[in-house]
Amino acid sequence: INHTRELNPSVFLNAHVSSHDCPDNEARAIYYNSRHFGKTRNEKRITRWGRGSPLQNPENTGALTLLAFKLDEQGGDCKEVNIWVCASTDEEDVIETAIGEVIPGALISGPAGQILGGLSLQQAPVNHKYILPEDWHLRFPSGSEIIQYAASHYVKNSLDPDEQLLDRRRVEYDIFLLVEELHVLDIIRKGFGSVDEFIALANSVSNRRKSRAGKSLELHLEHLFIEHGLRHFATQAITEGNKKPDFLFPSAGAYHDTEFPVENLRMLAVKTTCKDRWRQILNEADKIHQVHLFTLQEGVSLAQYREMRESGVRLVVPSSLHKKYPEAVRAELMTLGAFIAELTG
């Protein structure tokens, strides 16, 4: 249907949901190509998922989802789509082990063998504009080194920490993909002498991607806190039960000081996505009754949000993502800038 021979071409698809017990339905894929016909814009949609579809259940807001389209062997329109909507973090982890971090709101598309082949390097276009340090050709740099190098490539026209964070994550991720390509692509092109060699490399790539996904956001926040005058904090400080919250304010010493005012303590947990994962932070700092959670999650359902709030979790979300949340809760979301201002004011 990706053509302009007619206005708004469409095709009907048999939609089967493998992850949930619901009946098959006839969905409709349509290409609104009105711009070609003198109107405002073009966009593509899939509609008519049917009642009871997990794709339309608000409780699945933010869930990682796979859509597998069965291509017509003769080159005609696709007639079938198989759907998996992740219902748990365990399911999401299985997928991200194969393809690396899936950034909230991102669309990764292409032939199945490239996306889920175990060593997908093309989940995002690699930007070759960066001239990498020579010694990075011989060794894979640490996350801190990549962020330090990326600092000279950040957009300079904003002093808003919310905007800065998203820009810096984008630049740092571009550089990470370039370094990964530098170290892995030639090995893949040469092929493998055994299945064990392939598995070893696939595991190495997967582990590095997971490590980067887990630390990148924390490192960016640490740099931004310091730049914006928030210098009194501890990372990975030990609390009750040997727990290690991502950030404690103003310090680990203050947290353990029985005479320090409890109302002046803050804890910030960091999760790229918070659907279900938010429960992991509830007992990381027993003295702090309302904990803060920074996330890039693009929306949660009203029920999920109420459960977080009732459990003493306050969401900190970049300002540009607030519109992704239900209108009823937007006023209660904190921006990163507001969080920093509260602790530096």
Please describe what each predicted stretch is.
Residues I1-L64, F69-E73:
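Long, contiguous, compositionally biased segments that the model treats as domain-scale units
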Residues G52-L55, N207-K215, M267-T272:
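Short, charged/polar micro-motifs that form catalytic or ligand-binding hotspots
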Residues D72-C86:
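Short, Lys/Arg- and Gly-enriched loop/turn segments at beta-strand edges
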Residues Q74-G76, E91-V94, R277, S301:
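Eukaryotic short linear interaction motifs
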Residues V85-N127:
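Compact, glycine/acidic-enriched structural inserts
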Residues K129-K215, L219-H220:
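Interdomain/boundary linker segments immediately adjacent to catalytic/signaling cores
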Residues E222, I226, H232-G345:
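Catalytic core segments in nucleotide and nucleic-acid processing enzymes
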